[in-house]
């Protein structure tokens, strides 16, 4: 009883420690044991059967795999299967030499059956069949798959920089998150490792084929010597027994080798899609009824040649004609269903009903209108990913800015060009562009080596030049240094840019209330004391909108509300309260504008001009003389151009009383300019004025 309880305890511990990890070491021990220890014929039959079953499983898995990386362990499995076959060859050779003189059954039933059944009693035929199998495996399948793996590894490595840049572009545009970027980079690394491993693993199979020929020769001559000299067998009898066993041994090892070589060829030649190999072959071979019809005609003509087996050709011709008719009928039914759907849709349009309040449509905060050819981008059944990219944009926006933007509504506009799209903010068109579904845009990155043979276009977001290219040109463009992105990414990047530019328009009272309700869950005491006892929702909304207008994130609601609680008792002006909140958020503002910069290069204001502006504001109720205004615009333009030349931030640093006023009047003409007060830059940063706006 004690022994049984100990045994069950060991089994339970194996379950807890993931027994799968023991398979590799155990398999290696078994293979080494087969090479060293003598095996009984029955055990040899078991291992030969296991080898055949393993090769069939590997082939079927490779056939049903949809993506290459789904079977990433294949190179390792190829190594183990090759070692297993070689170990079986060693073990079977030992058994044949030790027991071969007792008859063909002495080496096991599997070897004997392969020797008798496949050879058919003729040793010459057996040798020829064995040599043909080895030639097919060595010269055709293994050599071809090895070359494909070698070229695939080279192209995968060459394409890695381009793929990495595309991932970085999606990440910088906010189309993907950090986790998704890590997954894509890991996938690229795995692909390179896989094809590199396959390049080396194919050498195992070629070496196995060569070893099979040498082992066959050694077994035949070794068997003749042992049978004739040691066991006093007649030379003819020894040749009969040992040749049959050797050929049976060779065939039972080479057939699984041929199957696994075929699996290797399937793995490296397949194209990664959502279909397995069988589905790809059927869908692509039998997709065109005209091709099948022409094949039937050619086959029928060949069947009329005198001496041909007419019945067989006739059967295949009729079969192909039937298949062509069925495919053509299926295609016509699909077209007919589409026409019926269109007619039903038009009939519904023609039935006019009375107007009602249901016909009154409220304006969407954010709307994208797309042309007919871009509809597949939002069709989930056609693998359209634009909706997923928009969800990622909204989520990233909420995490970085601090509030959830409104939903994006997408509709088809039949009046647009088929490849065009428009983006609306509260019913006003703020952007438009052209996209081609199924194509990619190769954007100039500054590292490209040569232009592409396509019409040059401009990316709608930043005006970068590029080319619309087909999928089969994607790898070439990446190798030439272009950043290649898909069509849906162009629209998503454009949308993300426009949302950022109109962020204050999207933050209404409804969003302010939703944000306040969300903050109330975390800080109920702070919100209850402040709103509506000290300030109301209208003032809070105005303050937050002022911050968003100048692209200041409102994530840190704790600091914002605490600052308002401190100063809003005596101060009710939203603009003044906004200035105080900005000072409290100075670390966030500084980090956003000058990330990882110890010395910040900014635009300064000459003291005489600064004093002139202060005096002008005090005397004329926050207005400025036209001549002074014109001078300010000219000097600001010059300073901005200088900042651009030295690649410095376009930031103007002024005294606190001037900040709000200058930001308001300069923002309209210079939207890229950020105006800060001296209190909004943290003390840890060293300020260097690289441009001066002077009188």
Swiss-Prot record:
<dbReference type="GO" id="GO:0005886">
    <property type="term" value="C:plasma membrane"/>
</dbReference>
<keyword id="KW-1003">Cell membrane</keyword>
<feature type="transmembrane region" description="Helical">
    <location>
        <begin position="121"/>
        <end position="141"/>
    </location>
</feature>
<keyword id="KW-1006">Bacterial flagellum protein export</keyword>
<feature type="transmembrane region" description="Helical">
    <location>
        <begin position="285"/>
        <end position="307"/>
    </location>
</feature>
<feature type="transmembrane region" description="Helical">
    <location>
        <begin position="247"/>
        <end position="267"/>
    </location>
</feature>
<dbReference type="InterPro" id="IPR001712">
    <property type="entry name" value="T3SS_FHIPEP"/>
</dbReference>
<keyword id="KW-0472">Membrane</keyword>
<dbReference type="InterPro" id="IPR006301">
    <property type="entry name" value="FlhA"/>
</dbReference>
<keyword id="KW-0812">Transmembrane</keyword>
<protein>
    <recommendedName>
        <fullName>Flagellar biosynthesis protein FlhA</fullName>
    </recommendedName>
</protein>
<feature type="transmembrane region" description="Helical">
    <location>
        <begin position="311"/>
        <end position="328"/>
    </location>
</feature>
<keyword id="KW-0653">Protein transport</keyword>
<dbReference type="Pfam" id="PF00771">
    <property type="entry name" value="FHIPEP"/>
</dbReference>
<feature type="transmembrane region" description="Helical">
    <location>
        <begin position="23"/>
        <end position="43"/>
    </location>
</feature>
<dbReference type="GO" id="GO:0044780">
    <property type="term" value="P:bacterial-type flagellum assembly"/>
</dbReference>
<dbReference type="InterPro" id="IPR025505">
    <property type="entry name" value="FHIPEP_CS"/>
</dbReference>
<dbReference type="InterPro" id="IPR042196">
    <property type="entry name" value="FHIPEP_4"/>
</dbReference>
<keyword id="KW-1133">Transmembrane helix</keyword>
<dbReference type="InterPro" id="IPR042194">
    <property type="entry name" value="FHIPEP_1"/>
</dbReference>
<keyword id="KW-1005">Bacterial flagellum biogenesis</keyword>
<comment type="function">
    <text>Required for formation of the rod structure of the flagellar apparatus. Together with FliI and FliH, may constitute the export apparatus of flagellin.</text>
</comment>
<keyword id="KW-0813">Transport</keyword>
<feature type="transmembrane region" description="Helical">
    <location>
        <begin position="71"/>
        <end position="91"/>
    </location>
</feature>
<feature type="transmembrane region" description="Helical">
    <location>
        <begin position="44"/>
        <end position="64"/>
    </location>
</feature>
<dbReference type="InterPro" id="IPR042193">
    <property type="entry name" value="FHIPEP_3"/>
</dbReference>
<feature type="transmembrane region" description="Helical">
    <location>
        <begin position="209"/>
        <end position="229"/>
    </location>
</feature>
<dbReference type="GO" id="GO:0009306">
    <property type="term" value="P:protein secretion"/>
</dbReference>
<comment type="similarity">
    <text>Belongs to the FHIPEP (flagella/HR/invasion proteins export pore) family.</text>
</comment>
């Amino acid at each position: 009883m004690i022994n049984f309880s100990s045994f069950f305890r060991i089994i339970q511990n194996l379950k807890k420690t993931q027994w799968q990890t023991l398979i590799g070491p155990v398999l290696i021990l078994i293979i080494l044991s087969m090479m060293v220890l003598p095996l009984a014929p029955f055990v040899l039959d078991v291992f030969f059967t296991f080898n055949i079953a393993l090769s069939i499983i590997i082939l079927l898995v490779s056939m049903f795999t949809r993506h290459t990386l789904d079977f990433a362990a294949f190179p390792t499995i190829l190594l183990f299967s090759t070692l297993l076959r070689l170990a079986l060859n060693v073990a079977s050779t030992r058994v044949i030499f030790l027991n071969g003189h007792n008859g063909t059954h002495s080496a096991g039933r599997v070897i004997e059956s392969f020797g008798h059944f496949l050879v058919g009693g003729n040793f010459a035929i057996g040798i020829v069949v064995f040599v043909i199998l080895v030639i097919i495996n060595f010269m055709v399948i293994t050599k071809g798959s090895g070359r494909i793996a070698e070229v695939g590894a080279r192209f995968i490595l060459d394409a890695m920089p381009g793929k990495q840049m595309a991932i970085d572009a999606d990440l910088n545009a906010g189309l993907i998150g950090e986790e998704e970027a890590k997954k894509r980079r890991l996938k690229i690394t795995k692909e390179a490792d896989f094809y590199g491993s396959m390049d080396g693993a194919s050498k195992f199979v070629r070496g196995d084929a060569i070893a099979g020929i040498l082992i066959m020769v050694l077994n035949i001559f070794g068997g003749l010597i042992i049978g004739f000299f040691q066991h006093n067998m007649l030379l003819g009898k020894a040749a009969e027994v040992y040749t049959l066993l050797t050929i049976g041994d060779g065939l039972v090892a080479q057939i699984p080798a041929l199957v696994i070589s075929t699996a290797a060829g399937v793995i490296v030649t397949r194209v990664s899609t959502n279909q397995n190999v069988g589905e790809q072959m059927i869908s692509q071979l039998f997709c065109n009824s005209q091709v099948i019809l022409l094949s039937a005609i050619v086959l029928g003509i060949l069947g009329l040649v005198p001496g041909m087996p007419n019945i067989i050709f006739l059967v295949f011709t009729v079969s192909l004609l039937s298949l062509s008719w069925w495919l053509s009928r299926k295609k016509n039914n699909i077209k007919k269903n589409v026409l019926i759907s269109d007619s039903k849709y038009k009939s519904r349009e023609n039935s006019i009903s009375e107007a009602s309040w249901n016909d009154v449509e409220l304006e969407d905060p954010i709307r994208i209108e797309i042309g007919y050819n871009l509809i597949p981008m939002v069709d989930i059944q056609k693998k359209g990913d634009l909706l997923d990219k928009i969800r990622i944009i909204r989520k990233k926006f909420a995490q970085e800015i601090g509030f959830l933007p409104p939903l994006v509504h997408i509709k088809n506009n039949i009046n647009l060009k088929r490849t065009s799209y428009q983006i609306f903010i509260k019913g006003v068109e703020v952007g438009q562009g052209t996209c081609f579904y199924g194509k990619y845009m190769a954007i100039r990155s500054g590292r490209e080596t040569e232009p592409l043979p396509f019409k040059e276009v401009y990316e709608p977001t930043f005006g970068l030049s590029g080319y619309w290219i087909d999928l089969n040109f994607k790898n070439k463009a990446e190798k030439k240094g272009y950043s290649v992105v898909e069509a849906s990414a162009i629209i998503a990047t454009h949308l993300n840019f426009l949302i950022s530019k109109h962020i204050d328009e999207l933050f209404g009272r409804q969003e302010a209330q939703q944000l306040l309700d969300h903050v109330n869950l975390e800080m109920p005491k702070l919100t209850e004391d402040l709103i509506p006892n000290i300030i109301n929702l209208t003032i809070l909304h105005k303050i937050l909108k002022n911050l968003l207008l100048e692209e200041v994130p409102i994530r840190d609601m704790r600091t914002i509300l605490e600052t308002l609680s401190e100063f809003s008792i005596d101060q009710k002006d939203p603009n003044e309260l906004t200035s105080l909140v900005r000072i409290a958020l100075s670390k966030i503002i500084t980090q956003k504008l000058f990330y990882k910069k110890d010395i910040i290069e900014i635009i300064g204001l000459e003291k005489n001009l600064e004093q002139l502006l202060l005096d002008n504001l005090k005397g004329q109720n926050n207005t400025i003389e036209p001549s002074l205004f014109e001078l300010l615009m000219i000097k600001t333009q010059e300073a901005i151009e200088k900042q651009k030349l030295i690649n410095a931030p376009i930031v103007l640093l002024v005294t606190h009383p001037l900040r709000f006023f200058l930001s308001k009047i300069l923002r309209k003409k210079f939207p890229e300019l950020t105006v800060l007060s001296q209190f909004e830059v943290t003390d840890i940063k060293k300020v260097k004025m690289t441009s001066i706006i002077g009188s």
